[in-house]
Amino acid sequence: MGRAIAEYWKTKTAERLRVFSPMFEEDEIPLTTLFRSYEDMPEIERKALDMAKGRILDVGAASGCHSLVLQDRGKDVTAIDISPLSVETMKERGVKKVIEQDFFTLGGQAMEQREPSSLLEWPSRDRVRRSQYDTILMLMNGIGIVGTLERMPEFFKQLDKILAPGGQVLCDSSDISYVFEDEEGMIDIPNEMDYYGEHSFRMQYKDTIGEPFDWLYIDADTLRQKAGRCGYEVELVAEGEHYDYLARITKK
């Protein structure tokens, strides 16, 4: 995706960003959707941006469209993405704080590698606070990076580390059970599927073919269950027109 984003930014034209999955027909991501203005974003994304406050982390920021909106409002926002080309593009577009890193490895790595040899080595409260965020944004189904339900406890453990006291996670996802509806309106999930929202994808742009990756579409009830078991609660903030929703996750 990074190559497609970089080329579109430089030329304002790009070929198809194709998406493949064993469960679905070939699809494509219109690159214009990654460069939208606030006015062109879906209501759910606009609502999330309006709710963002404090120190903000924009996860999987891609081209930085959400970060730029918040930055223009004077917000303290940091964008994170694993793609070097996406990170480069965001910097060229004017995003001031950009990190090339995996969400699951963000924050406090050095202080977790070993026990301190003395009390003097313990991180100060201010230092810990600087590695935490008041709002974590995971938009455009950003929570999908978790990949599988089995990995949800790891996600909440990471929140324990980087979410500031009183902080919030604003994420959107979709209940895709409708994909498995039969003619009678009954949900018919294939027996081999552990959870109908767990899928594998691969992207292709021109001659660049990415590695397969797991992606999670999680329904709101399942998100509540997983969050509750890990000491978090979920508030359903808004529902979209395409089985999508915006959730607010906070520590109990």
Tell what function each PLM region has.
Residues 104, 132-153:
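A short SAM/SAH-binding and catalytic strip from SAM-dependent methyltransferases
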Residues 7, 165-224, 228:
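SAM-dependent methyltransferase
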Residues 37-55:
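Conserved alpha-helix/loop element of class I SAM-dependent methyltransferases that forms part
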Residues 1-20:
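N-terminal auxiliary segments of SAM/dcSAM-dependent transferases
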Residues 63-74:
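Conserved SAM-binding loop of SAM-dependent methyltransferases across substrates and taxa
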Residues 153-165:
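A short glycine-rich, Lys/Arg-flanked "PGG" loop and its adjoining helix->strand segment in the class I
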Residues 94-106:
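Conserved SAM-binding strand-loop segment of SAM-dependent methyltransferases
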Residues 83-84:
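Conserved SAM/SAH-binding beta-strand->alpha-helix loop
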